[in-house]
UniProtKB/Swiss-Prot annotation:
Superkingdom, taxonomy of origin: Bacteria
Cellular component, GO annotation: cytoplasm
Name used for this protein in its record: Gamma-glutamyl phosphate reductase
Localization of this protein: Cytoplasm
Keywords: Amino-acid biosynthesis, Cytoplasm, NADP, Oxidoreductase, Proline biosynthesis
Family membership: Belongs to the gamma-glutamyl phosphate reductase family.
Length: 446
């Protein structure tokens, strides 16, 4: 079987389960999720053994320590996957939920009901726990899923999918609703992305190059975010302690993720007080500060910044997703200038303001066009679990129905449902005699 046939085969298997999935009870779905959780614990030693194969191969290829860490599965991470499954099982089932209902003057009752997207292709890198997160969300939302993990985790992903399928068989959940691309042939992905009619949406999770490759080569809709250039603006009316802690948390707590800040924007009236203090703490954490002219001149010889690497910023630094202990600094004269800066250099992911001025905070929320906008809190909270949504499929910056963390509800779409009692458009029904027959021949008329 060549790569094209392979892709079509698994897509058709997934598509063939769509009608069956839509009629599953919540109990059946939860039973499958909870049985998967049990099997993860029962087969933990097998998971770790298969994961070691991936780690050994990755080490031979010279992968970085950071990547090796993302690949690794241990007792703690397996227990976290178990908890994800339990959490998703505990969430309300979105399928079939009526989200709107109204009555028209003619008596028609019109509403919207949540229904599954259909078949979801998720393409991801490095982290095998995504296999469990993605499958669990798709199963609970009655979507079929095609899982395409990275070649570096194929052994880990294979055993995890085998466990999911075992749970499906044991709980009467259609196991072919969970498909796994069990090959490292990259051409399979290219073929999958062309399968309009079989696959309804693709969701890439990984680096910018992967996401761009998927978006540029796909004929099916793609839900994505290219990168997370997140910004923190410290207003001249900011509480200093809040500003310092938020800036430190948003950059240092976990710098390699998409919701960490990359740009620190500071009002000039508070810059002389705030920047030396944050430079001191950034220095202790090993953060390099790439500064505009004003902040560079302020910090380069400042005693508070003596242990901090201070370098001049280049224009391209403000566009960069560093994913590292590096931050670009910009000093501005006004809130409007800060918002303009964020619009130009940000990626519409997550942006925050620190201010004690309510009016300024509300203007920031109104004017900053991002998936998540904060007042007096760290951008690190842009996450399905942190928002109380449960596990997530990823974070979308697209301007579609799914924006921000994509959890259960974002894996459904509304369908109009209409209840009538014999209503007719313009009361035109079967005529009593042929002379009453009237047909509107205007092709453009509705």
């Amino acid at each position: 079987m060549d790569s094209r046939q392979y892709a079509e085969n698994i897509a058709k298997k997934a598509k063939n389960t769509v009608r069956k999935l839509s009629s599953l009870t919540t109990k059946t779905k939860n039973d499958a999720l909870l049985r998967t959780a049990e099997l993860l614990l029962e087969r933990k030693s097998q998971i770790i053994e298969e994961n070691k194969k991936d780690l050994e191969l990755a080490e031979k290829k010279g992968y970085s320590k950071a990547l090796l860490d993302r690949l690794a599965l241990d007792d703690k991470r397996i227990n976290q996957m178990v908890q994800v499954l339990k959490d998703v099982a505990a969430l309300p089932d979105p399928v079939g939920e009526i989200i709107n209902m109204w009555t028209r003057p003619n008596g028609l009752k019109v509403g919207q009901m949540r229904v599954p997207l259909g078949v979801i292709l998720i393409i991801y890198e490095a982290r095998p726990n995504v296999t469990i997160e993605a499958a669990s969300l798709c199963m609970k939302s009655s979507n079929a899923v095609i899982l395409k993990g990275g070649s570096e985790t194929i052994n880990s992903n294979r055993i995890l999918v085998d466990i999911i399928k075992q749970a499906c068989r044991e709980t009467c959940f259609p196991e072919e609703a969970v498909q796994f691309v069990d090959t490292t042939d990259r051409e399979v992905v290219n073929h999958l992305l062309k399968l309009e009619g079989l696959i309804d949406v693709a969701i890439p999770r990984g680096g910018e190059s992967l996401i761009r490759a998927v978006a540029e080569n796909s004929k099916i809709p793609v839900i994505k975010h290219y990168k997370g250039v997140c910004n923190l603006y410290v207003d001249d009316e900011a509480d200093m302690e809040k500003a310092l802690n938020i800036a430190y948390n948003a950059k240092v707590q976990r710098p390699s993720v998409c919701n960490a800040i990359e740009n620190l924007v500071v009002h000039k009236k508070i810059a002389d007080k705030f920047l030396p203090e944050i430079a001191y703490y950034f220095g202790k954490a090993g953060v390099e500060m790439r500064c505009d002219e004003y902040s560079y001149n302020l910090l380069i010889n400042h005693p508070k910044a003596k242990d901090t690497e201070i370098v001049p910023a280049k224009e391209e630094d403000y566009y960069e997703e560093f994913l590292d202990l590096i931050i670009a600094v910009k000093v501005v004269d006004s809130l409007d200038e800060a918002i303009d800066f964020i619009e130009k250099y940000g990626s519409h992911h997550s942006d925050a303001i620190v201010t004690e001025n309510y009016t300024k905070g509300m203007k920031f929320i109104q004017d900053v066009d991002s998936a998540a906008v904060y007042i007096n809190a760290s951008t690190r909270f842009t996450d399905g679990n942190e928002f109380g949504l449960g596990a997530e499929m990823g974070i979308s910056t697209d301007k579609i129905h799914a924006r921000g963390p994509m959890a259960l509800k974002e894996l459904t779409i509304p369908k109009f449902i209409v209840f009538g009692n014999g209503q007719l458009r313009e009361n035109v029904g079967i005529p009593k005699d042929e002379s009453e027959i009237k047909i509107d021949t205007n092709a453009c008329s509705l």
